[in-house]
Regions:
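Membrane-proximal basic amphipathic "stem/tether" segments
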Residues: 1-35
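Active-site and donor-binding regions of nucleotide-sugar-utilizing enzymes
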Residues: 29-166
Length: 166
């Protein structure tokens, strides 16, 4: 599986390089893969961006990875759309781990939005090698939690806990 992820990462980066030929736009991209619907946080942030920056386009791409084999094949094509939007936006806001981590040197500013529930569970690097987590090799192949410029959280009280996972 690690080999497959590494090959996929090379392919995705090659496609991303092609998409970077297109101009960057005044656009904020929201990516979410845990659900097909945006969270209230995403909608509120999108609305505030629209209010403060009416000339900035906002794009929501919310789609969970399907369970079926053919659904996963279809999701690969959806990822191409994500790559194009990523290559042509100025800011991307992530609600969960996403394709951005697989890209080497993404062009836009990358913001990871973390919900307060994160202090109630272990995640990311704090679970490597444990039952609920990935192996170190898999985490490295996925480039888990890489490429973030900023991480949004509910407050300063969450910082130490979140640093363990990132």
């Amino acid at each position: 599986m690690v080999f497959v992820l590494r090959v996929a990462r090379i392919i995705l980066n090659a496609i991303y390089i092609i998409f970077k030929i297109f101009p960057q736009k005044n656009k904020v991209l929201f990516l979410r893969q845990q659900s097909d619907d945006p969270t209230l946080d995403i909608l509120m942030l999108r609305d505030k961006i629209r209010e403060l920056h009416p000339n900035c386009k906002t794009v929501l791409m919310c789609k969970s990875v399907p369970k079926s084999f053919f659904g996963k094949i279809g999701y690969c094509f959806y990822m191409l759309g994500q790559l194009f939007q990523l290559a042509t936006c100025k800011v991307v806001i992530l609600d969960s781990y996403s394709i951005v981590s697989l890209i080497k040197n993404p062009r836009p500013m990358v913001v990871q939005m973390w919900h307060s529930i994160g202090t109630m569970k272990k995640f990311g690097y704090s679970t490597i090698g444990k039952k609920e987590g990935h192996s170190r090799a898999m985490a490295d192949a996925m480039r888990m939690h890489k490429n973030y410029d900023y991480i949004l959280c509910a407050g300063k009280g969450y910082v130490d806990h979140l640093c363990q996972g990132f």
